[in-house]
From Swiss-Prot:
Gene Ontology biological-process annotations: maturation of SSU-rRNA from tricistronic rRNA transcript (SSU-rRNA, 5.8S rRNA, LSU-rRNA); translation
InterPro entries membership: Ribosomal_Su5_D2-typ_SF (IPR020568), Ribosomal_uS9 (IPR000754), Ribosomal_uS9_archaeal (IPR019958), Ribosomal_uS9_CS (IPR020574), Ribsml_uS5_D2-typ_fold_subgr (IPR014721)
Protein family per UniProt: Belongs to the universal ribosomal protein uS9 family.
Membrane-crossing segments per the record: none
GO molecular function per UniProt: RNA binding; structural constituent of ribosome
Entries under SUPFAM superfamilies matching the protein: Ribosomal protein S5 domain 2-like
Protein name (database record): Small ribosomal subunit protein uS9
Top-level taxon in the UniProt lineage: Archaea
Length: 135
């Protein structure tokens, strides 16, 4: 039996996590068992498609299955694009593709570490304070 190359990678954004499984195939991409072509909203779909457009020839030769959980829909989309880009890079081992990803957007390969500041007492949020009266 021939060895089938399967690569599993993950990506994170805020509290969202995505796991991508990539294997040789016909170019099918599914996000939570839904084809990426009908994934809603459109802005999230465009974010997910970015690494696939950059790695055009490779993306047509592999099937990608992405499972996302946690966070909001946009954070899930950004976690999914990171997972897809890492999977494509690990599957191909192409240094040119790595340079193309980094040149386009560094967060395709590196998780965005920004987090929400916690709310502090004396106000409604992390920075906003209650109005004070001095007379």
């Amino acid at each position: 039996m021939s060895e089938m190359k399967i690569v599993v990678t993950s990506g994170k954004r805020k509290t969202a996590t995505a796991r991508a499984v990539i294997k040789p195939g016909k170019g099918r991409v599914r996000i939570n068992s839904v084809p990426v072509e009908i994934h809603q909203p459109e802005l999230a779909r465009m974010k997910i498609m970015e690494p696939l457009i950059i790695a055009k020839e490779l993306a047509e030769k592999v099937d990608i299955e992405v499972k996302t959980w946690g966070g909001g829909f946009m954070a899930q989309a950004e976690a999914a694009r990171t997972a897809i880009a890492r999977a494509l890079l690990e599957f191909s081992g192409d240094e040119e593709l790595r340079k193309a990803f980094l040149e386009y957007d560094r967060t395709l390969l590196v998780n965005d570490v920004r987090r929400k500041l916690p709310k502090i007492q004396g106000g409604r949020g992390a920075r906003a304070r209650r109005q004070t009266s001095y007379r």
